[in-house]
UniProtKB/Swiss-Prot annotation:
This is S-ribosylhomocysteine lyase. Homodimer. Fe cation binds at H56, H60, C123. It catalyses: S-(5-deoxy-D-ribos-5-yl)-L-homocysteine = (S)-4,5-dihydroxypentane-2,3-dione + L-homocysteine. Keywords: Autoinducer synthesis, Iron, Lyase, Metal-binding, Quorum sensing. It comes from Staphylococcus epidermidis (strain ATCC 35984 / DSM 28319 / BCRC 17069 / CCUG 31568 / BM 3577 / RP62A). One of its GO terms (biological process) is quorum sensing. Binds 1 Fe cation per subunit.
């Protein structure tokens, strides 16, 4: 396989076992700041995907709530394949803490009574949301918390 510019295009999606959270890359800025990008894979690539309303609500809930647990988040974005999200942190390379931050954020999702910014002023497709869908996705991921660091399903 030819090396691609996009890191995830170099990942063999047939070898990974979701759910997992993996360090997908780092980038150092001119002033020494380091961005750590993590792949939060909720669904098995090419076998499952998140339905868009649930994914969309999960994005809103995670993007808003993760910042209550750390000031190191640069961005949280959904993958176009609908199998996961990317989250980027600045100057924060503690993998175990990242797992805990994601855990806390997903518990916030379970406790949510509404989707933040779920309106036409603050969202580009406000009609496409499902709080219950987001909660179902979050619970399924939390149910397999012990697998998050086992990217290839090796029982490690």
């Amino acid at each position: 396989m030819t090396k691609m510019n996009v890191e995830s295009f170099n990942l063999d999606h047939t070898k990974v076992v979701a759910p997992f959270i993996r360090l997908a890359g780092t980038m150092e800025g001119l002033n020494g700041d380091v961005i750590h990008k993590y792949d939060i894979r909720f669904k098995q690539p090419n076998k499952e995907h998140m339905d868009m309303p649930g994914l969309h609500s999960l994005e809103h809930l995670m993007a808003e709530n993760i910042r209550n647990h750390t000031d190191k988040v640069v961005d949280l974005s959904p993958m176009g394949c609908q199998t996961g999200f990317y989250v980027s942190f600045i100057n924060h390379d503690d993998y175990d803490d990242v797992l805990n931050i994601i855990d806390q954020t997903l518990h916030d999702v379970l406790n949510a009574s509404e989707v933040p910014a779920c309106n036409e002023v603050q969202c580009g497709w406000a009609a496409s949301h499902s709080l219950e869908g987001a909660k179902t996705i979050a619970q399924a991921f939390l149910d397999k918390r012990e697998q998050w660091n086992d990217i290839y399903g090796e029982g490690k």
